[in-house]
Design a protein with these regions (language model features):
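Compact, glycine-rich, soluble single-domain proteins
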Residues: 2-112
Length: 112
């Protein structure tokens, strides 16, 4: 998998960020609080770059695809950046995916 720099039009790129390495590539992970930022993702990301979501501490959260017009692969990581789950999310799906463990990071990319 090839990953490029994360893109997020809603947040100041010079704000609070972390470096995130996955599969030999470095990404910039922005702190996002999903309950307030449901529409982030790929909506205004014309290059469809992968996105990394992270939180200040591990949380239980769920993901859905109600407003997303792409099929996505999503990877869930613990605080040690080890994969603890993944899912393929169908576009405009009403289904929710809720990891059984607390997650610290989630990486979303367009399914190819």
């Amino acid at each position: 998998m090839a990953f490029k720099q994360v893109y997020n039009p809603y947040f100041d790129q010079d704000g609070e960020v972390k470096t995130f390495s996955f599969n030999g590539k470095k990404l910039t992970a922005l702190y996002l609080y999903r309950e307030h930022d449901q529409e982030i993702g790929f909506k205004e990301n014309p290059l469809l770059k992968p996105l990394v979501f992270t939180w200040k501490k591990p949380i239980y959260t769920c993901f859905n695809m109600v407003n997303v017009p792409y099929e996505l692969e999503i990877f869930f990581f613990n605080a040690d950046k080890k994969i603890i789950g993944s899912a393929v999310m169908e576009k405009f799906s009403q289904k929710q995916y809720c990891p059984k463990e607390k997650i610290q990071f989630a990486l979303e990319r367009i399914k190819t």
